[in-house]
Amino acid sequence: MRCTVFGTGYLGATHAAGMAELGHEVLGVDIDAGKVAKLASGEIPFYEPGLRKLLNDNIAAGRLAFTTDYDAGAEFADLHFLAVGTPQKKGEYAADLRHVHAVVDRLVPRLNRPAVIVGKSTVPVGTAAELRGRVRGLAPGVNVEIAWNPEFLREGFAVQDTLHPDRIVLGVQRDSSAAEASIRELYAPLLARQVPLLVTDLQTAELVKVSANAFLATKISFINAISEVCEAVDADVTLLADALGHDPRIGRRFLNAGLGFGGGCLPKDIRAFMARAGELGANHALTFLSEVDAINMRRRSRMVELATVACGGSLLGANIAVLGAAFKPESDDVRDSPALNVAGMLQLNGATVNVYDPKAMENSRRQFPTLNYSTSVSEACERADAVLVLTEWREFVELDPAGLAGSVRAKVVVDGRNCLDADRWMRAGWRFHCLGRGAAAHSR
């Protein structure tokens, strides 16, 4: 089977390579000639474990190619995926759909035979219905169906999530005649492994993704709110989360108290969800998401407060090592990164900040050029008054506190992700600070 993928960023490149791995012929289309040239040569412009090999294997097999030519994309296949970004509008909560509209406006007039356009991008509910009207005006007389197949990729696990998904959701038009059959053929290898396929209307499929992200964000902010109470009474939020997680109705995943969530999805998606609910007159239904967002942002301020305490009450003149810049481990994504945000606030409060991340240094320099960047943990920690672990890379979790002691000026560590073994660090003579554990971390 043949398909095209319009947009070759994180989502598009992963989907294109994944569909080629399933045995299909795939053409990735993007207006960015530099990005297309990199991908065509087997390079990916971001870090994602396993994706480069997947890309190169399928280019070599002749199943995957990339182009800037929309005419070639329109001619290549009758199944077209939209995988462009939907960022937050500047100064607003709403999603910016200009990239989605641009692809549709360029592609559809070039279609001269029946086709199915399938959205992968995260969009406000009602977008697919709006695109249906747009398509009818752009290609009168040509049967072009709109469908929605939301992605559920986790950065750092995108290849796994593409080739071994938990479920496949497909939203189709009520009068659809081709979309479901096309998707069943495309995903046949996955369906043969009993991956569930849920076929819905368009608006339900659009809501599935944003609802999933809203729920995950709520779960993270819930445990972070509880961690504030734990700090007030010297309880241990990690033990509390373990106890909650044994309840099968709750589960342990996403109950990791710490610095909170960031990245290019959860923050902007819950804000866009709130904005869309307001447009639909259902704003009261999602007011709780405002508090979810507020709790999440408050964690960053709380980390600065904790660092200030760790440095004796003032950051002025303090030398602080920040370990972690990506918003999560196994990624180089620094969009709305809590770690970088905290590093910037520390600098604004008078500290000299030295940042190290195994994969996100280049992106970090572009976003925060005024910070100091180091090439290793030991360099970042040289003569540090405090070491802050803000992204839970394995390299940081497995640090040897005794070995690191020779680099720092003061043996003070602040665990922003509750990922370190507190007892191990304290036995090595370090003062240990963390979020949500109060004195409990010092008493075991």
Label each region the model flagged:
Residues 1-444:
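Structural/interface elements that position substrates and couple domains in central-metabolism enzymes
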